């Protein structure tokens, strides 16, 4: 399972435009599947973009901790499930840094599974 980060503003805008948004208590997830401009001839399965604002916390140490937690959550979820050709942007909200890891894992996996298995 290969995970890489979104590199430029155009990729972020493309995912925001074509992706589906899930608003959870601790984060906003924008997720899209099979976007050809990014996935064309790529060995990577998952493209991840993380937007951590200074409004969330002024200290860079805390913002970096949030990014590390998000990357670890994505690795756990992707190793447990068979996700392919997926691009997502995660925007954490207030309380993300103090939230329990198991709660974050449950919410994120629920949002990703809702994307793959939409309710009718």
Swiss-Prot record:
It comes from the Bacteria. GO terms for biological process: tRNA 5'-leader removal. Keywords: Endonuclease, Hydrolase, Nuclease, RNA-binding, tRNA processing. It catalyses: Endonucleolytic cleavage of RNA, removing 5'-extranucleotides from tRNA precursor. InterPro entries: Ribosomal_Su5_D2-typ_SF, Ribsml_uS5_D2-typ_fold_subgr, RNase_P, RNase_P_CS. HAMAP family: RNase_P. RNaseP catalyzes the removal of the 5'-leader sequence from pre-tRNA to produce the mature 5'-terminus. It can also cleave other RNA substrates such as 4.5S RNA. The protein component plays an auxiliary but essential role in vivo by binding to the 5'-leader sequence and broadening the substrate specificity of the ribozyme. This is Ribonuclease P protein component. It comes from Rickettsia bellii (strain OSU 85-389).
């Amino acid at each position: 399972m290969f995970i890489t980060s979104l590199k430029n503003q155009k990729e972020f805008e493309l995912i925001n435009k074509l992706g589906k948004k899930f608003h959870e208590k601790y984060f906003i997830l924008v997720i899209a599947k099979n976007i050809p401009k990014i996935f064309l001839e790529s060995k990577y399965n998952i493209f991840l973009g993380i937007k951590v604002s200074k409004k969330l916390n002024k200290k860079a140490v805390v913002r970096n901790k949030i990014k590390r937690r998000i990357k670890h959550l994505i690795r756990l979820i992707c190793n447990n499930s068979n996700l392919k050709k997926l691009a997502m942007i995660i925007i954490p909200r207030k309380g993300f840094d103090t939230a329990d890891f198991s709660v974050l894992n449950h919410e994120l996996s629920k949002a990703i599974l809702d994307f793959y298995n939409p309710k009718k």
